[in-house]
Amino acid sequence: MITYDLKGKTALVTGGASGIGFATATVLAKAGAAVAINHLADDPRGPEAVAKLHAMTGARVISAPGNVGDAADGPRMVEQAVADLGRLDYLVNNAGTPATRTTIAPHELDRLTEEVWHTLLQVNLLGVFRCAKAAAPALRAARGAVVSTASIAGINHAGSSMAYGATKAGVISLTKNLARGLSPEVRVNAVAPGAVDSTWMIEWTNEQRASSIDNALLKRRCTPEDIAEVIVFLLAGAAMVTGQTIVVDGGLTT
């Protein structure tokens, strides 16, 4: 893994209490950055993650409770995190949801309710826009960077539902347009993970678990750390990369 010296830098990681978010926060903190971990206000994993990461790294780690899927709470959370950190160099839009615990196949249209669509759009797509918009002044001042978590479901893979895939395709499109809108001061990119070992796989069938390995060229699933490595590269390195989505799936979609 490439290492960076991020002393004096700050980062806000949404959905940072577990999985890809916590792995990314860990890499940033180990490199010396001060990190704000966003989590839902009633999620006990948030304060636990903050305490754990501070103990692991000695870095400044703060809690940033709030719901990115809420039109008022999301921007409020970002503004408070920026105020607490004093500046903002990096925004990681990682918070997301599948909205359902089980896969909704393309032919199961009746299961794709308005409620499912609303939840997915509010969190996965509008949440990304809200956070980027709220963070834009601070990011411009710092000449910072944004990385959002998309998915191979937004490109050419089934994902948990067609609605989930549509929101992730939206993140990919939004990434290009935010890169235009925030240039030249801020770089904006995305990662599109494939199958990742995480709590999202709890409801997967044995067949789904096996196929996610068998169909990948590298014959393993991604770990949260695999994705975090690319996210931090896009934040702290990759000085001439913007508006791009990097697929990290071990060759699953190749």
Describe the predicted segments one by one.
Residues 10, 17-19:
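Conserved glycine-rich cofactor-binding loop
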Residues 33-48:
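Conserved glycine-rich Rossmann-like NAD(P)H-binding loop of the short-chain dehydrogenase/reductase
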Residues 151:
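Residue(s) in the substrate-gating loop at a strand-loop-helix junction
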Residues 102-118, 201, 212:
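Substrate-binding pocket helix/loop in short-chain dehydrogenase/reductase
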Residues 132, 167, 175:
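Active-site helix of classical SDR
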Residues 132, 138-140, 183, 220-248, ...:
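C-terminal substrate-recognition "lid" of short-chain dehydrogenase/reductases
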Residues 43-44, 65-78, 114, 225-226:
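The beta1-alpha1 cofactor-binding region of Rossmann-like NAD(H)/NADP(H)-dependent oxidoreductases
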Residues 89, 110-129, 147, 171, ...:
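Catalytic Tyr-X3-Lys loop
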